[in-house]
């Protein structure tokens, strides 16, 4: 799908990959990027001719409904996410619930609000930002991976209902990105700018649930050959 001239909503746009996506979309010629942030102090630095920062906590029905009233969106990028590090047997239920509410239910909430506008004009794209570890769990962030596995499955369901309306749904799957979320996580990391650029390519080429980066591609190739071996290797990465 062409990006130039489009009206695009990015959730979780205040920093990290979200901020990089906003910059990349403007550079690619987007007409308006609606940049969703939770904190008021994060909005002012985002303001520009083609960027409209808005209050958007994806766990808030009121925030989501307010953004939906701003009018139809051409491309929705569900980027907002939180990650809890730890053992699912001992992590607090509050942390688990936050991951589910932001990473999964937040996507459902925003997509439900935005999809009717796409359906009405018989055109649009929904991009869900997951991880290649949605396909095989990385235990140190095991519950985060579980929410992203749910997101990958959700994308398949959304395609079933939206394809007849010419609304494309893709789930992009990077591995670890060098952002605040991965600070202290001693593994190879991709830059947020690289991942943003790859996501824009996936949008333009309408790729089907693409892995992002060499590590993600390699992981998916290994999974196709010997999924049990991959799982056993990743079992060593625990909190």
Locations of regions flagged by a protein language model:
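Residue(s) in the substrate-gating loop at a strand-loop-helix junction
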Residues: 131
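Substrate-binding pocket helix/loop in short-chain dehydrogenase/reductase
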Residues: 87-97
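Conserved glycine-rich cofactor-binding loop
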Residues: 14-15
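C-terminal helical subdomain
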Residues: 171, 179, 183-221
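Active-site loop immediately N-terminal to the catalytic Tyr-X3-Lys motif
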Residues: 89, 138-142
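Conserved NAD(P)H cofactor-binding loop of Rossmann-fold oxidoreductase domains
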Residues: 80-85
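A short, exposed helix-loop element centered on a Lys and neighboring polar residues
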Residues: 111-112, 156
């Amino acid at each position: 799908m062409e990006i130039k001239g489009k009206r695009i909503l990015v959730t979780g746009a205040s920093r990290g990959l979200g901020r990089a996506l906003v910059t990349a979309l403007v550079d690619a010629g987007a007409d308006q990027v609606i940049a969703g942030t939770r904190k008021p102090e994060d909005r002012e630095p985002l303001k520009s001719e083609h960027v409209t920062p808005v209050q958007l906590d994806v766990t808030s029905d009121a925030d989501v409904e307010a953004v939906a009233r701003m009018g139809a969106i051409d491309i929705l990028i569900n980027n907002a996410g939180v990650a809890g590090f730890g053992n699912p047997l001992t992590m607090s239920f509050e942390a688990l619930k936050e991951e589910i509410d932001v990473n999964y239910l937040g996507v459902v909430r925003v997509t439900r609000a935005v999809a009717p506008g796409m359906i009405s004009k018989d055109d649009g794209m929904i991009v869900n930002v997951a991880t290649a570890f949605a396909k095989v769990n990385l235990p140190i962030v095991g519950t985060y991976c579980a929410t992203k596995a749910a997101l990958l499955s959700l994308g398949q369901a959304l395609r079933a209902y939206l394809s007849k309306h010419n609304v494309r749904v893709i789930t992009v799957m990077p591995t670890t990105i060098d952002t605040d979320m991965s600070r202290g996580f001693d593994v190879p990391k991709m830059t947020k700018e690289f991942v943003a650029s790859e996501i824009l390519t996936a949008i333009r080429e309408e790729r089907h649930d693409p892995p992002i980066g060499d590590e993600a591609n390699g992981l998916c190739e290994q999974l196709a050959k010997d999924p049990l071996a991959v799982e056993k290797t990743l079992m060593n990465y625990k909190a």
